[in-house]
Design a protein with these regions (language model features):
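Active-site segments that bind and position negatively charged phosphate/pyrophosphate groups
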Residues: 1-120
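C-terminal charged capping/lid subdomain of soluble metabolic enzymes
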Residues: 101, 105-178
């Protein structure tokens, strides 16, 4: 639908602009496109007519509360383990993400393979531009996990309402990420 196409276009724009900004930090156009993309992504237009999933933000906020890291850094640290956990519950959307954002050829792949390839492409891009991929990089360790899980507000209405055990699983996978 239109909301999905808009979101996918914004993500493609972010990928292009972030690569350009990392290659040349003084590239005003690239940086302005990152900000413009972020503005559109967060102005609620993308969620019109959709069930929204904000759980990754809730986990990120809890990580920030314990580590004092910025929200963007906490999101990048927990996004991949979270998306891999919920992928089976939004398989069609993750498969679309792979083809429409990353250009992955769907030939010979089922939705699960396609979705996993899309998340692998996202991980490669995040590494390429220098995103934080582990909460350890933010100052968390095994002793922080219970406090972060306790501070995570779980929300209904997304792909899945996470249990505390699942939140801890996301955190442990992020902690172990290299």
């Amino acid at each position: 639908n239109t909301s999905d196409y808009l979101a996918e276009s914004l993500m493609r724009s972010l990928v292009t602009a972030s690569r350009a900004a990392v290659a040349n930090p003084t590239n005003y156009e690239a940086r302005s496109n990152i900000m413009w993309t972020a503005t559109w992504a967060l102005n609620t237009l993308m969620g019109c007519g959709k069930t929204q999933d904000w759980e990754v933000h809730m986990i990120g906020q809890a990580v920030g509360a314990v580590t004092d890291a910025t929200h963007g850094m906490t999101l990048s640290a927990v996004a991949l383990p979270y998306y891999r956990l919920i992928m089976p519950y939004g398989l069609e959307k993750f498969a679309r993400f792979a083809t429409n954002v990353w250009g992955i050829n769907a030939a010979g792949k089922d939705d699960e393979e396609l979705a996993a390839a899309g998340l692998d492409a996202m991980e490669n891009w995040m590494r390429e531009i220098g995103c934080v991929l582990s909460i350890r990089e933010l100052g968390a360790d095994e002793s922080s996990l219970d406090a972060i899980a306790d501070a995570t507000l779980t929300m209904t209405g997304g792909y899945r309402t996470l249990t505390r055990v699942e939140v801890l699983d996301v955190l442990r996978k992020s902690l172990a990420a290299k």
